[in-house]
Amino acid sequence: MKEFIPSKLPLKKDIETKEILRATITAHKTLAELKGIANSLPNQKIVINTLVLQEAKDSSEIENIITTYDEIYRSDISDSFINSDIKEVQNYKDALYLGFDIIKTKKFLTINHIKEIQSTLEKNDAGFRKQSGTVLKNPTTGEIKLIPPQNPKDIEELMTNLVDYINDSSLEDFDSLVKMAIIHYQFESIHPFYDGNGRTGRIINILYLVLENLLDVPILYLSRYIIKNKADYYRLLNDVSFNDGLNNWILFILKGIEEISKETIKTIKNIENLMNETKNIIVEQKPKIYSKDLLEAFPDVKGFSVTNISYIR
């Protein structure tokens, strides 16, 4: 198999078919509903903390880093519970928060920002690949599916082009959700790092939604959708490169945005119910200590919701 070098962006293709336009409208509708519900919450922090934890676990699971919620919460209480997989999940959470802070303060994303996010994930400063030899294989069969760019100059040029595309909406007159699908494919195809490409790419997804003002906080994550549709995810991703499958890839991502938006709305409502139940229990059993400040402090309590995370989901 030959080395595959993706075309630079914009693609200059007519890809917004009627089917894609319909799927885009539906995805926007559910995403807007999610944004509105999240913004109406009196305390967004507990929602963000819960969903970031779920994403850190799920995104790591795609890379065969398997943990449980109880293990994660125990590690938050005491370092004695930390193992290598738990540390990977914690690193992902730190990298995601770092990226969100960058978008909030800078309002754009640079190559150095992406390197910083990946460095937080992998705890190394290797930066972009400088040595050849990286290949992408089928995780089940071991078959080589893609040989990404090998020349460091190509990687640097493609990543410069990608961040320009991320930051400059005038480069292509596509809907932002369609562009997110293109950005995700492009990053995966470049595969600029030795390690952590998949998780870095999924962080870029949510940061792009915030950058485009489609969400105010990082609460929509496609990792659960990818886990449920893992074979389709890798097949469709590969088809973009070799079978002119960009339209099907975009439809897959738009469906994921719609599906996960609905699931996240349900999760937020469950969190609200849980908080109200907690409030009622405290008022009934410990009325002297109850206060609004106490209830809103729960997200900062180590181990909070360790017994309720399955109910929240």
Feature roles, as predicted:
Residues 1-313:
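FIC/Doc superfamily catalytic core
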